[in-house]
Amino acid sequence: MLPAVVAGELLMKILVLADVESKYLWDYFEKEKLEGIDLILSAGDLKPQYLSFLASFSKVPVLYVHGNHDDCYDIQPPDGCIDIENKIYVYKGVRIMGLGGSIRYKKGKNQYTQKEMNHRINKMWLSIKKNRGFDILLTHSPAAGIGDGPDEPHKGFEGFNYLLEKYKPKYFIHGHIHRSYQIKFKQEYEYNENTKIINGYERYIFEYPDV
């Protein structure tokens, strides 16, 4: 299949996944459903077998960050997939920065205080500088006060607000907030003139201007 062209620009079609394994893709899988997909991004809390399954049937990279329920990744990481935690992965010129995990609300892995997440962000400084910023921020949790929840486990990270304001990525992609948690649930919306936000709950496809 030829890549899509809009107004003279090549577009990269990206499949985003998070939180719930899609029956459409897993239980009722047909290889044709992945046709035209150029990249797969997982925002966390998905079974490793699910990601491995999709990786085995697609010929594109499957990038992922950890959700707060992904402790099993330490023992059984998704086969054929690429962990981009605390990294910037460049694919076809698109710079994708990964920071998984949720706010700390109990004992366990992949949970962080605001201070701990800020420390992780600070450690990314050299990589951000080397890559001259990033185009997509891929996380599990949302930013503070932007599509997050009122309860402690679903609060967003303040450090993500800083990243959006300072580096102005084209897309901020997260999970963690399920469709049932919000009356006015939106999967894609504009944060400002620079950045669109996508909640990748279950599955979502968007097109990124290819460079």
Task: Mark where each language-model region is.
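N-terminal active-site segment of His-dependent metallophosphoesterases
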Residues: 2-57, 127-133
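Active-site neighborhood of phospho(di)ester-bond hydrolases with catalytic His/Asp-centered motifs
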Residues: 16-18, 39-45, 63-68, 84, ...
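Conserved catalytic scaffold of divalent metal-dependent phosphoesterases
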Residues: 16-24, 66-155
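Binuclear metal-dependent phosphoesterase catalytic core
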Residues: 17, 26, 88-92, 163-167, ...
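Active-site environment of divalent metal-dependent phosphoester hydrolases
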Residues: 21-25, 46-52, 68-74, 104-108, ...
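A generic local structural motif
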Residues: 25-31, 49-52, 82-84, 122-126, ...
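Short, structured coil segments at secondary-structure junctions
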Residues: 57-58, 78-79, 193
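A short, gly/pro- and small-residue-rich
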Residues: 58-68, 157-160
